[in-house]
A protein has these predicted regions:
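ABC ATPase NBD coupling module
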Residues: 28-30, 86-102, 120, 128, ...
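Helix-to-loop junction immediately C-terminal to a conserved catalytic motif
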Residues: 69
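Conserved ABC transporter NBD signature motif
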Residues: 77-85
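Conserved ABC ATPase signature
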Residues: 159-164, 168
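Conserved catalytic motifs of ABC-family nucleotide-binding domains
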Residues: 181
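ABC ATPase "signature
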Residues: 245-246
């Protein structure tokens, strides 16, 4: 049963951009130059669930994830996390809450510093948030390396990201996200750059870590196969709006919105 109190609640969340125009374009054009990447989204995410956010590239999924984390400040609406409105927090208060909200990005190579060893990269969030003395960080990092399947841990600790495969890099990124013991993990296309066989291994790892660490996932993907395999509920996003929301099997077997139907028709093997 779903608990009554959501871990994350979005209320009329907006992320709008204005395109810069030159003087003459402004003078002779009455067109609205606002891009509504996230346009009035209401969404609730409950403890222990995996909510999939699906849609085509460019529909606003990644912008939504960055707005939830306040990597981008919302232009309107509210983000409530643990019943606290993040839009009202000061920068230090927000930094404190970020320990509880972590992100796994699409490209692990881009988010890992090539000059830092694997061990130092994973330890970095521990030290930033002052969760343990530097002398204790190495033991915590090696424990996390073991949890994500990078063994022997002492060897991987001293390697650099460029010495690892894509799947191993993503395991490091997962370890880095989980080292602060967050409650919410936002996964932005975390397996889309991996080979199919490695995808399945990383998804299985993420599922077991979810149970072990009592995690809640917001799982962003354009891959409907992955969403159906991994998610409890599905939110379908199109042009900055959530157009359909429901339990995974219900959305796949009985889609209500024309956009959802079109998405599924483009991947016919998924239906039924």
């Amino acid at each position: 049963p779903i608990p009554s109190s959501p871990l994350l609640r979005l209320q009329n969340l907006q992320q709008h951009y204005r395109l810069e125009q030159n003087f003459f374009a402004q003078l002779f054009s009455n067109a609205d130059t606002t891009i509504r990447a996230v346009d009035g989204i209401d969404l609730e995410l409950y403890p222990g669930e995996t909510l999939g956010l699906v849609g085509e590239s460019g529909c606003g999924k990644s912008t939504l994830s960055r707005t939830v984390l306040h990597l981008l400040r919302p232009t309107g609406g509210k983000v409530e996390f643990l019943q606290q409105d993040l839009t009202r927090l000061s920068r230090p208060q927000l930094q404190q809450q970020r320990r509880q909200m972590q992100m796994i990005f699409q490209d692990p190579h881009a988010c890992l510093n090539p000059r830092m060893t694997v061990g130092d990269s994973i330890a970095d969030p521990l030290l930033i948030h002052r969760l343990c003395p530097p002398a204790q960080a190495k033991a915590k990092v090696e424990e996390m390396l073991e949890r994500v399947g990078l063994t022997p841990t002492h060897e991987f600790y001293h390697r650099y990201p460029g010495e690892l495969s894509g799947g191993q890099q993503q395991r490091v990124a997962i370890a880095r996200a989980l080292i602060t013991r967050p409650k919410l993990v936002i996964c932005d296309e975390p397996v889309s750059m991996l080979d199919a066989s490695i995808q399945a291994q990383v998804l299985d790892l993420m599922q077991s870590l979810k149970q072990e660490f009592d995690l809640t996932y917001l799982f962003i993907t354009h891959d409907l196969w992955v969403a159906r395999y991994f998610c409890d509920r599905i939110a379908v996003m199109n042009a900055g709006h959530i157009v359909e929301l429901g339990e995974t099997e219900k959305v796949f077997n009985h889609p209500q919105h024309p956009y959802t139907q079109a998405l599924l028709n483009a991947a016919p093997l998924l239906k039924g």
